[in-house]
Amino acid sequence: IWMYNYCWPETGWTIIDYYLTRKISFYFLKRAFATKKLIIRACEGGAEVTVINETPEAFTADIHCGYMTFTGETDSLRTKTLKVAPHSMQQFHISVCNDLKHGFFFASAEGFDTADSLRAYYRDYVFPESDAKIEKVEQDGNDLLVTIRASVYTPFAYLMTSDDRVHYD
C-alpha cells in the first residue's frame, strides 16, 4: 500500500498513521486480502454467496446464511456444505424475499469473517432506535478500551473524548 507511513493526521490513502495506529480502512483491506473469504451480495430473488479459497489446500466448510433484521431476528436460515478446491471460488444462490430496508443477508462459517450485504447507503435503511450503553471502560497501556452493548443493530456510535490531536510547538 503506498503512502502507508504518512506523518500528517489527515485522511488520505494511508491505512496506518505515523504512530502505527490502524485507520478504519486497515480492517477493510485486511478482509479484502484474506486468503479465505465469504462474500454475499443481494441479487434478484435473494442473494449470491461467493466462497473464495486462495490457499494451496482444499477445504470443506459449512456455510450458514440467511436474512437478519436490525433487531436480530433471523429468517430463511440455510446451511450448505461446500468442498472448495485450492485457488478457486464457488458461488451459490439463496432464495430469500425479505425487506432489505429493515435487515440484511449474511453468511458465516468457521474460520471466516462473517459477510453481510450491508452497503454504505445508510440513508436507505430503517434502523430501530438504539439502546446502546457503555458496559465497561478499561485502560490497556496507552489505549482506552470501551465496551458498548446494544440489543439492536447500531451502525454508528460517537464517543466524545478529550482532544487527542498532535500539537507541534
Which residue ranges define each predicted feature?
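Carbohydrate-binding surfaces of carbohydrate-active enzymes
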Residues: 1-156, 164-168
